[in-house]
Amino acid sequence: LSLHIRAGEIYGFIGHNGAGKTTTLKAAVGILPFDEGNITINGRSIQTEPLACKRELAYIPDNPDLYEFMSGIRYLNFIADIFGVSAADRQARIRDYAARFELTDDLAQPIAAYSHGMKQKLAIIAAWLHRPRLVIMDEPFVGLDPKASHLLKGMMRELCDQGGAIFFSTHVLEVAEKLCDKVAIIKGGRLIRSGTMEEVKGDDSLEQVFLELEDETC
């Protein structure tokens, strides 16, 4: 498996359940160890310089495991403290993102009282707080309502327009086809096709190509 995600790119990662998407993403952010190969972020190895790498990235898992005993605002301040975000910057960013996701009135409530969608919104806000260069997300649209999904897509493109990069897995092929600059298809931990959307799908739909590749490699 060899991928190169460049600044300015939204890179989609697709495959059926159990294909290895989550394992790959967890290895990329330093959660899971690996025996061979190397993962570098902005020229630094996640194995030899994990802290330097983690300062430049944000990770949203498929089921965000938040500190439910905290309130939303306490959790966001906790994350901001970890990344050294100044008081002025965090206040402005929290105010902005919470307003976008209509979460402002809920930040004082304990996270334990949040719905799945609200937790997902909070995780997204937390990920964007320190202005990461790379955001890695596992099925980020699951649980989001249409408005929040639209907002997230805009934030992803905005980050890339500012020189960042996005790497995310999804089962929603229509979203990947419309949103991604590049896409990689994985099966059994092995890359079976990657490239720009035009290179991967040609004149067909991404769904059609994905299903054909699945059949060919069975």
Model-derived regions, located:
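ABC ATPase "signature
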Residues: 194-195
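Conserved ABC transporter NBD signature motif
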Residues: 37-48, 52-53
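Conserved ABC ATPase signature
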Residues: 110-114
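Helical segment within the ABC ATPase nucleotide-binding domain
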Residues: 149-162
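Conserved ABC ATPase "signature" region
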Residues: 77, 81, 88-106
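Catalytic Walker B motif of ABC-type/P-loop ATPase nucleotide-binding domains
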Residues: 135-139
